[in-house]
Amino acid sequence: MATDIAAIVRHLEAFYPFRDKAVVHVGAGGGQFIAYAAHAKRVVGVDPDPEAVDRLKTAVREAGLQDRFHALQADLMTVTEKVDVVFFEFCLHEIADPAAALRHARTLAPQTVVVDPAPGSKWAWYCGEEEKVVRSWAAVDRDPPALAARFIGKQSFHDYGELAAKIGMLGEPTLTRIAEFRDRTDFEIAMPYRMALLTTG
């Protein structure tokens, strides 16, 4: 499986200047998108999943970013560190109360960057997350973002087994929805996503 992570990171770096910024990075577990941190002042990567945090620590070490990237197993709502920007990495829709998460982010930083699947995303539909995505963007759009952009990413798979290994554990309706790929090989699923910059004051 390949997500075009390098392209997403390029879009992220063009969308928001992380250089010399102190960052709280929400949903950082796994460390897939940490390349932007090479130019940041310091980053606290937050994820509640201990296994994801272990993967994040490994990614940080392999990228040589230990001097500026600290991995923290925690819920965002318990974080109190003041920074320049809070960055939600494809996770706002997974938070039970996205509006509350955004309110808490505003107590930590004057700016918030949200990257999340776009409403209408086929990938979100296969994952059974379309309602979550709509809810999270409704919370973001409650106050018009200072800056917004939309991109089309992709998820690439060699076969159905690879797809099922990635999202089959979500159960229904995902298993029924991805059944159309059972006999297909080397296919892609579009993953449109949005970026938004929220500011306080």
Can you describe what each PLM-predicted range is?
Residues 49-51:
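Conserved SAM/SAH-binding beta-strand->alpha-helix loop
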Residues 85-98:
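A short SAM/SAH-binding and catalytic strip from SAM-dependent methyltransferases
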Residues 56-57:
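Conserved SAM-binding loop
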Residues 30-40:
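Conserved SAM-binding loop of SAM-dependent methyltransferases across substrates and taxa
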Residues 99-112:
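A short glycine-rich, Lys/Arg-flanked "PGG" loop and its adjoining helix->strand segment in the class I
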Residues 30, 135, 141-201:
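Conserved Class I S-adenosyl-L-methionine
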Residues 113-140:
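Conserved class I S-adenosyl-L-methionine
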